[in-house]
């Protein structure tokens, strides 16, 4: 159930649902079941949605948001995650969940998957159901291919459909992220005939040392001039590329002030923010504070 009620008192301290960046994204093939084989590098940033939870003795799961229309997809994943954990653990109580939605939908930042992961991690802790991280990741994978990396909570090289994870430590750079005013459908990108699907598969050490790119970028910038314009502007200030299937693009900076200086010059018709790369996610840090 979804409600537009405002946030209540007597709830848990907020749990972050961080954004991720795909520092590179290669499409190496397509399986018989239609899913695409990927090689990608996930890193978290300190820009997040926030969720609050109030545990109840009654079995209802109720989601509250003041932005219910614009976050319908995320709402659905949050409730699906809560129901999946409740079903697996046979937990008899429920929860009221409050969502503060800050991450854009259809931006390639993983907002919906991150919301689902935070719901699983937080409710597992608050319900004291004691499900292992590996089992939580299995439950998360049924909700979306990106959910396990958010549950894992560490920057990772990923293969398969994105679920095979190897922990890595890329530089924790500063990023200027631009949010074009367009929603890009992940499904539409992966179904498009012009998407490259034959990038050679490389070992992790080779991938970590080469110039990084995103196989979805050419298609998306061709279809969405807002994304192309954002990249054209940003690349003047820093090495830049698209995250995920877009629409967000990011430029990489060594120091925060460099990113802030570029942000100050952002054209009036563009929106963006500065964020810090994090190899341990804000969610993982929050969990360790319990």
UniProtKB/Swiss-Prot annotation:
Family: Belongs to the GHMP kinase family. IspE subfamily.
Binding site residues for ATP: 104-114
Reactions this protein catalyses: 4-CDP-2-C-methyl-D-erythritol + ATP = 4-CDP-2-C-methyl-D-erythritol 2-phosphate + ADP + H(+)
Entry keyword Repressor: no
Function: Catalyzes the phosphorylation of the position 2 hydroxy group of 4-diphosphocytidyl-2C-methyl-D-erythritol.
GO MF entries: 4-(cytidine 5'-diphospho)-2-C-methyl-D-erythritol kinase activity; ATP binding
Alphabetic keyword roster: ATP-binding, Isoprene biosynthesis, Kinase, Nucleotide-binding, Transferase
Protein's UniProt keywords contain ATP-binding: yes
Enzyme class: transferase
Pathway the protein contributes to: Isoprenoid biosynthesis; isopentenyl diphosphate biosynthesis via DXP pathway; isopentenyl diphosphate from 1-deoxy-D-xylulose 5-phosphate: step 3/6
Protein's name according to its UniProt entry: 4-diphosphocytidyl-2-C-methyl-D-erythritol kinase
PANTHER family: 4-DIPHOSPHOCYTIDYL-2-C-METHYL-D-ERYTHRITOL KINASE, CHLOROPLASTIC
InterPro entries hit by this protein: GHMP_kinase_C_dom, GHMP_kinase_C_sf, GHMP_kinase_N_dom, IspE, Ribosomal_Su5_D2-typ_SF, Ribsml_uS5_D2-typ_fold_subgr
Gene Ontology BP terms: isopentenyl diphosphate biosynthetic process, methylerythritol 4-phosphate pathway; terpenoid biosynthetic process
EC number(s) on file: 2.7.1.148
């Amino acid at each position: 159930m979804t409600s537009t009620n405002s946030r209540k008192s007597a709830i848990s301290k907020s749990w972050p649902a961080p954004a991720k960046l795909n520092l590179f994204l290669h499409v190496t093939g397509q399986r018989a079941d239609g899913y695409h084989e990927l090689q990608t590098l996930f890193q978290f940033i300190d820009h997040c949605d926030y969720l609050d939870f109030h545990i109840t003795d009654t079995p209802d799961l109720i989601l509250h948001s003041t932005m219910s229309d614009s976050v319908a997809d995320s709402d659905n994943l949050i409730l699906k995650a809560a129901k999946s954990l409740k079903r697996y653990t046979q937990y008899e109580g429920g929860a009221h969940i409050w969502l503060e939605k800050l991450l854009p939908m259809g931006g390639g930042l993983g907002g919906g998957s991150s919301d689902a992961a935070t719901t699983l991690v937080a409710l597992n802790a608050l319900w004291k159901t004691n499900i292992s991280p590996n089992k939580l990741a299995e439950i998360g994978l049924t909700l979306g291919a990106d959910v396990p990396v958010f549950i894992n909570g560490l920057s990772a090289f990923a293969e398969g459909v994105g679920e095979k994870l190897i922990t890595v430590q890329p530089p924790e750079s500063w990023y200027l992220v631009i949010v074009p005013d367009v929603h890009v459908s992940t499904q539409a990108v992966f179904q498009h005939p012009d998407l490259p699907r034959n990038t050679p598969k490389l070992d992790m050490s080779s991938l970590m040392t080469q110039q990084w790119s995103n196989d979805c970028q050419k298609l998306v910038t061709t279809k969405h001039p807002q994304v192309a314009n954002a990249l054209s502007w940003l690349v003047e200030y820093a090495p830049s590329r698209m995250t995920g299937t877009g629409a967000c693009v990011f430029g990489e900076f060594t120091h925060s002030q460099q990113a802030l200086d570029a942000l100050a010059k952002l054209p009036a018709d563009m929106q963006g923010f500065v964020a810090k790369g994090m190899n341990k996610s804000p969610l993982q840090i929050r969990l360790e504070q319990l």
